[in-house]
Amino acid sequence: MATEFTVAEPDVLVATTLFLIERGVTPYQFSVAAGKGIDTSGATERLRSAFAAIGRSPRFSGNGPDILGISDSEWWVVECKGSGTGQPQTQRNNFDRALASVVSYYEEEPQGVSTQQQGVTVCLCLALPATRAYLNELQRRVRSPLRRRLNLWVLLCEPSSRSIKPVSPDAQF
């Protein structure tokens, strides 16, 4: 995979956070990835700074979904994944782990929210760079019936601009 398609997971997480805020969803918990080549402290600082600008302080967790967010009508559970320069098999394995994680977060009702927020819609979300490898896997393995049943959104992070293209559960890739 070419280097222009390298998108670090923290970049996907920050772009997804900005998308959620624009949608009216308040992210309240983050689990920032750690590992080889990942600038965890940089991503954490970027999130802290962004939230300080709006007078909030995000909560960080060492495990679970990458982002939890709530609005008056939606509860978002987000799994983010970056792309690297690894072999195609590595990219497929990363995709498999991300898909398995987001599906494992499925709930019929929001968890850990106030009683006033219990009736909101649960939105699962897989946020990925819009690379050829990930797009192929999405088209091949994450078909519309599954996305509709789970209310699974896919957020595609454009590698060059880091902007998000949302794909709703009813839309095609």
Where does each model-flagged region fall?
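Short glycine/proline-enriched coil/turn segments at helix->beta-strand junctions
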Residues: 21-22, 72-74, 120-122
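Domain-level recognition of nuclease-like catalytic cores that cleave nucleotide substrates
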Residues: 123-173
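Active-site metal-binding core of divalent-cation-utilizing nuclease and nuclease-like domains
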Residues: 4, 29-77, 91-94
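Nuclease catalytic cores
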Residues: 2-25, 35-41
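Catalytic cores of nucleic-acid endonucleases
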Residues: 81-141
